Amino acid sequence: MGKISSLPTQLFKCCFCDFLKQVKMPITSSSHLFYLALCLLAFTSSATAGPETLCGAELVDALQFVCGDRGFYFNKPTGYGSSSRRAPQTGIVDECCFRSCDLRRLEMYCAPLKPAKSARSVRAQRHTDMPKAQKEVHLKNTSRGSAGNKNYRM
């Protein structure tokens, strides 16, 4: 999966390509220079801007996108850097809503992958699986006890 560019970065690339096409013309007007300055400003503001925070529905959407079918936790599952001392537990909201977080931080809250179910062989199914009707008959016969079909009067 490729790196996702921010909107200002994409805008700069588009502006810069357009400007280079226009520079080939011998006349450079002040509007062209203004256009270039605007593009440079957009690029530098995107370079200095830090990661954004995710809260509420945006946080849930981001987790669903990153984790997919695995699902996710709002608190870190046990075993993620837990020490012997009980530290105050922080969750995804503390890490990504109150502070900014990156993709790796979001991935830490994904549920583990479930192992793929292995296909059982046909031979194993023949010997272990009985049709439902046979199971019911088998259960009826075993529930009579050791007396069989004999009726005892008392």
From Swiss-Prot:
Keywords: Disulfide bond, Growth factor, Secreted, Signal
Region (Disordered): 121-154
CDD domains given in the database record: IlGF
CC per GO annotation: alphav-beta3 integrin-IGF-1-IGF1R complex; exocytic vesicle; extracellular space
Residue pairs linked by disulfide bridges in the UniProt entry: 55-97, 67-110, 96-101
Protein name, as recorded: Insulin-like growth factor 1
Upper lineage: Eukaryota, Metazoa, Chordata, Craniata, Vertebrata
Polar residues composition-biased segments: 140-154
Protein's organism: Bos taurus
Family, per entry: Belongs to the insulin family.
Domain of life: Eukaryota
